[in-house]
């Protein structure tokens, strides 16, 4: 992935969208692109929180494992990020994140992300807003007494013309 594509992805993310082009160029130099395939585990619950991930394309599932039970916490799409809480708290990852499709992520190491937060207060403020949003969603789910179910439809875009993977 070229540097201008990384900058464009940063501009479209909630976390970095308010930064100017010079700041985005600086951040893009610290970031690395990694690719995962469907069913790959991107991070495991319990691993050290060494980096922030920004989804460039694809869909991931965030799951928490308690005992032998797996709990789906969220589906994340392009523009979403994960790994922020572990970096801020310097604790192991609180969830396992797996690829549901081919996924490209931008990876920013912990120390680099912390220096970005110190240098760019607007990113820290946006991160606080995003984390507050996550907390409110979590509280709504707990208070409703019901499990919310979200459906994500992933179509195989590489099928032959005229064929479908649904219903056959």
What are these regions (language model features)?
Residues 1-166:
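Cytosolic regulatory regions built on CNB/CRP/Popeye-like sensor folds
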């Amino acid at each position: 992935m070229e540097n201008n594509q990384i900058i464009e992805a940063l501009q479209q993310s909630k976390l970095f969208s308010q930064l100017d082009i010079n700041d985005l160029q600086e951040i893009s130099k610290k970031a690395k692109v990694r690719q995962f395939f469907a069913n790959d585990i991107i991070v495991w619950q319990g691993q050290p929180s060494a980096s922030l991930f920004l989804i460039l394309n694809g869909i991931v599932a965030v799951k928490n494992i308690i005992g032998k039970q797996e709990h789906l916490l969220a589906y994340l799409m392009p523009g979403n990020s994960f790994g922020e809480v572990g970096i801020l708290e310097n604790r192991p990852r609180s969830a396992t994140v797996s690829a549901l499709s081919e996924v490209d992520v931008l990876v920013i190491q912990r120390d680099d992300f912390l220096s970005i937060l110190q240098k760019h207060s607007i990113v820290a403020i946006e991160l606080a807003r995003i984390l507050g949003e996550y907390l409110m969603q979590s509280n709504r789910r707990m208070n409703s007494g019901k499990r919310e179910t979200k459906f994500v439809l992933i179509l195989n875009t590489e099928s032959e013309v005229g064929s479908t993977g649904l219903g056959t």
